[in-house]
Each structure stands twice: as structure tokens, then as C-alpha cells.
């Protein structure tokens, strides 16, 4: 496998820490050891997160092409668009963000706080569009790219989640290589890695990275899209493309993509009672915050899998914390009593 042939623009602090979740593990019976890899703490650029790790591989391509404007898309409380805005500000580039109405949630300040507030503060051209949720390419995004060109700019297209991009899976191949180095220091290997999946390139990159030592199917995706068939197809497609690019040396089979569909409801961006319980439990036991859209759902999935005995006793499970906490302010009514 050859990730090193791809240029990488450093936007993160370096390897993200692995933190034992001792109190949560004990609360769930102590038979499974839970850890978190804190990609939510990976950068000084507007709170960072998993997209910042991905952007390290997209930015060299943007600069090599002489682009002057980063153009991306997400929901109103998109972590992706906030991280793209931060990177654009850091590099002195322009930024156009298409923010669609992906979440059926209504709050008086939903479009004025959290991620979208930060994007505006960092100088991004934020464009609100009423279209609903979908992980595919969007006409509103293509229109924004055309608008930048019409105005004489040179846009760089960054799809939702950095995912359906030729280089979108590379960052989390690097995540797997980083984990292997940390495992050597810790003196043990993780039996499972739990990760939230929506647009797919985070899990896809992990699948490829961990396939290098036979652990592709130990990456347990927790669907948060509530459209798992579409998400699964995109994970597999991105993983296969990424495997070819990094010269993995083996095919990615459909069985290498494990996606648990039980925790994504009721729909994208809306938590269920299990999501909210998991958010509160992790906060109170560990002081670790998760959000209602992504990490709360993957935390719920991990907790339930422990409770149901789906991880064998003695397993060491690594939870990939991808970020998302800036969106909590937009859901303040849900947590008005804690």
C-alpha cells in the first residue's frame, strides 16, 4: 500500500490521541474495553474534525490547479462546510458554501448558530437553499461552481463530506496507518473500530487502511443517513476506488463493508431517544460531548452493541470521534434540561 505518493497539506496537529473510556466501559459491565480516537480534537482550524483530515489530501490538488475558491455543500448545520470555510480562510482562498435544508428540524436560531455561524464569521459566502437531503451530487452545488466560473474565478469542487471525490478516501487510510502505529506503542490491537457513516468516505478509507492487515470487516459503520442502501453503495464504491489509488493489492469485497442500519432513525439529522440517551450518558460519565446528527448515533450504536453482547467479552473497541460538537447549539431546545 502506498499512501505516501500523494501530497498532503498539513492542517492537523498530528496523530490524534486515543483515550480510554473507563467509566463508560465499567457502566456497561466492564467486559468490553472502550476507547475513543479523538479526531474531534485534530486541528486548530475552527474545531477541526474528520473533514479536516480529508482536506489535507484535497488541498494540494486545489493548489496545483491554481484554484482560488473552494466550493462545497452540506446541510444548514454542516460540519463539512464549516471545515472548508476554515481551511479557505487559513489559505487565503475564497469560499462558497451551499447550505441545503437537509434536516426536518425547526428552531428559531437553527440557521444562525453553530457551524453556519462560524462559516459566516470566517468570511464564507453562505447560500441557503431549500432543497432536502441527499448524499449525491446536487444541482445547487453545480450551479454555485458555474457561478464562480462566470464571475472569473477558478473553483475547486468539494462534494458533501469530501466523499465522492477521487481523493476523498485517502485521509482515513492515513487514520488506519496512524492507529497501527499507536497500537504498537499501546502493546495491543483493537478488535473493532466503530465509526459513523453518511456520505461514506470516512468508513471507506478506514476499510482500505485496515484491509492492509486483514481487519477491513472489523470497521463497524453506524448508519446516520437513514438511507443505508445508498450509503452502503457509496462506501463500497469509494473504498474500491481508494484501494486502487493506494495500490492496496487486494480487492475490496462487499462483505468488507459492515454497516449497522439500526440507529439512524427517524431520519437524517433527527435524534431518537437512544441517540439522546447515549449523548447524555457519554457526557456525564466521560465529559465527552457528541452531537445529535452523527456522533450521538454512532455512540448509541456502540453502546447498544455492548449491551446486546455483540462484541465478545474481552474485546477492545475503538470509537472514532469525528467531531460535530459545534452543531449542539442549534439543538439547544433538546438539551434545555441537560
Swiss-Prot record:
Gene3D superfamilies: 3.40.50.1100. It catalyses: 1-aminocyclopropane-1-carboxylate + H2O = 2-oxobutanoate + NH4(+). GO terms for molecular function: 1-aminocyclopropane-1-carboxylate deaminase activity; D-cysteine desulfhydrase activity; pyridoxal phosphate binding. Keywords: Hydrolase, Pyridoxal phosphate. CDD domains: ACCD. Its cofactor is pyridoxal 5'-phosphate. It is an enzyme of class 3 (hydrolase). GO terms for biological process: 1-aminocyclopropane-1-carboxylate metabolic process; amine catabolic process. It holds the Pfam family PALP. Its EC number is 3.5.99.7. Catalyzes a cyclopropane ring-opening reaction, the irreversible conversion of 1-aminocyclopropane-1-carboxylate (ACC) to ammonia and alpha-ketobutyrate. Allows growth on ACC as a nitrogen source. Belongs to the ACC deaminase/D-cysteine desulfhydrase family. Homotrimer. This is 1-aminocyclopropane-1-carboxylate deaminase. The lineage of its organism: Bacteria, Pseudomonadati, Pseudomonadota, Betaproteobacteria, Burkholderiales.
Amino acid at each position: 500500500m502506498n499512501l505516501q505518493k500523494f501530497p498532503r497539506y498539513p492542517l492537523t496537529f498530528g496523530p490524534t490521541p486515543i483515550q480510554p473510556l473507563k467509566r463508560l466501559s465499567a457502566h456497561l459491565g466492564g467486559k468490553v474495553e472502550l476507547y475513543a480516537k479523538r479526531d474531534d480534537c485534530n486541528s486548530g482550524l475552527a474545531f477541526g474534525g474528520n473533514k479536516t483530515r480529508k482536506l489535507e489530501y484535497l488541498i494540494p490538488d486545489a493548489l496545483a490547479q491554481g484554484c482560488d475558491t473552494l466550493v462545497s455543500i452540506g446541510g444548514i448545520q454542516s460540519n463539512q462546510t464549516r471545515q472548508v470555510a476554515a481551511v479557505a480562510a487559513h489559505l487565503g482562498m475564497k469560499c462558497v458554501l451551499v447550505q441545503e435544508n437537509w434536516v426536518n428540524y425547526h428552531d428559531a436560531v437553527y440557521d444562525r448558530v453553530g457551524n453556519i455561524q462560524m462559516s459566516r464569521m470566517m468570511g464564507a459566502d453562505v447560500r441557503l437553499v431549500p432543497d432536502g437531503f441527499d448524499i449525491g451530487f446536487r444541482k445547487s452545488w453545480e450551479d454555485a461552481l458555474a457561478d464562480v466560473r462566470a464571475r472569473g474565478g477558478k473553483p475547486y469542487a468539494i462534494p458533501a463530506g469530501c466523499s465522492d471525490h477521487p481523493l476523498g478516501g485517502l485521509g482515513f487510510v492515513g487514520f488506519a496507518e496512524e492507529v497501527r502505529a499507536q497500537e504498537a506503542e499501546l502493546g495491543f490491537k483493537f478488535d473493532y473500530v466503530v465509526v459513523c457513516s453518511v456520505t461514506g468516505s470516512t468508513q471507506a478509507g478506514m476499510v482500505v487502511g485496515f484491509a492492509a492487515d486483514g481487519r477491513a470487516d472489523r470497521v463497524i459503520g453506524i448508519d446516520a443517513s437513514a438511507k443505508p442502501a445508498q450509503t452502503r453503495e457509496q462506501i463500497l464504491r469509494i473504498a474500491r476506488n481508494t484501494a486502487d489509488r493506494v495500490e492496496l493489492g487486494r480487492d475490496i469485497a462487499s462483505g468488507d463493508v459492515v454497516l449497522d442500519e439500526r440507529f439512524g432513525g427517524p431520519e437524517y439529522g433527527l435524534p431518537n431517544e437512544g441517540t439522546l440517551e447515549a449523548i447524555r450518558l457519554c457526557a456525564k460519565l466521560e465529559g465527552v460531548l457528541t452531537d445529535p446528527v452523527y456522533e450521538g448515533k454512532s455512540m448509541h450504536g456502540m453502546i447498544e452493541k455492548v449491551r446486546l453482547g455483540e462484541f465478545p467479552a474481552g474485546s477492545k473497541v475503538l470509537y472514532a470521534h469525528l467531531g460535530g460538537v459545534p452543531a449542539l447549539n442549534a439543538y439547544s431546545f433538546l438539551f434545555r434540561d441537560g
